[in-house]
Amino acid sequence: MTSNEIMRIFADTAYVRTGGSPEELRCAEYLKSYAESLGLSATLEPFTVSLAAIKEATLTLDGESLPCKGYFCAGDAEIEAPFYYLRNTDAYSLSLCKGKIVMVDGYLGYWMYKDILDNGAVGFITYDGNANYADFDIDQRELRAPLQKEGKIPGVNINAKTAIDIVNRGVKTAKITLSQDEFEGNSHNVVVDLPGEIDQYIVFTAHYDSTSLSQGSYDNMSGCVGLLAMAEHFSKNPHRYGMKFIFCGSEERGLLGSKAYVAAHEEELPKIVLNINLDMIGCIMGKFIACCTTEKDTLAYLNYFASERGFGISVRQDVYSSDSTPFADKGIPAISFARIAPQNTATIHNSYDTPALMRGVQMEEDIDFITAFATRMANAVVCPVKREMPDNMKDKLDIYLLRKRAPK
């Protein structure tokens, strides 16, 4: 795949495609069609996702209405209460949430939500964006399923500049009105199957959905381009192990596509020896990394292999927040490759993730390295990455998947 062909795919898919949306399906069909144009057989595998349509979402602070977006799947409510900005998460600070609409810093994860709920919050406000950027964009957020199980309270998202302003003004009272229709729809995985000489597989994953403001070129059409290029390569070259290329839907909504694939293909999992995941490669700036949810010997192997190839890499053992994780949780060793740019050169999950961040030549270099590594794995007599999950990775998987809380 040439640089020009790579950049054409970025141009063709430069639109927002949130999980479960018509635009996401449009992109799935594009990837399927592109794979078929390469002579590959591709299938769409649907899976159910929760969806919502906001009818009304308002935030009023001390009588002034401010721009906001209501959280999907956070129910219907009209709540007026004292405003409280939760700066710290110690027991005293959390105790002040009782009976209040609480604004929190950063992403509203499961444990933060549980803490404010357990301490009596009646509503919540989050914010995103950057105070140093000119835009007043507001991301569309959702109350994910694990949070819903703890109970629903209404919430809205605002821009960071608005958050600074309301704290600076010393706002006292907040009112949230939220009304929405909640329903179910479909997202899709696109699957390409390349049988090998033996009945064991290496699974390649990359998600193709985006967040609500993003064209998703860097995160993560780049990974999908990598999968297309590798699928084309291995369709023309021998490989002892079979290969499955899975373009995952709804990753940005909680790894829903890879979770759905693992659940729907339980009988296949013992045959999978390795997962190779691509999430954010080929950016103009940044360093190339490999995050290995594997035994530690894999790190040395990758460092040696990169030195042999003359390719710069930073390798670590960890859990990567991407579609590799559901496979690792089933005991399948998983390696995620990415090129991580400094935040002042390329950002994600906002309107600045566009094809302008990408470089065709860098994409080619990254894909060539990953393909070379995959070739070693695919033609090994025995896959050298042990099919076992060390205890330290099991512990990190438990934390990431919310089965236990990280120590403070």
Regions found by a protein language model. Name each.
Residues 14-22, 32, 103-106, 151-153, ...:
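Second-shell loop/turn segments in exported
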Residues 35-36, 106-107, 117, 200-255, ...:
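Alpha-helical metal-binding/catalytic segments enriched in His/Glu/Asp
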Residues 1-23, 38, 132-144, 209, ...:
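N-terminal capping segment at the start of a domain
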Residues 199, 212, 248-347:
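Metal-dependent peptidase/peptidase-like ectodomains
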Residues 68-148, 152-154, 313:
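Extracellular/luminal Protease-associated
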Residues 8-98:
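Noncatalytic luminal/extracellular "stalk/propeptide" segments of secretory-pathway proteins
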Residues 64-67, 74-91, 139-217, 232-236, ...:
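Soluble metallo-hydrolase cores and metallopeptidase-like ectodomains found primarily
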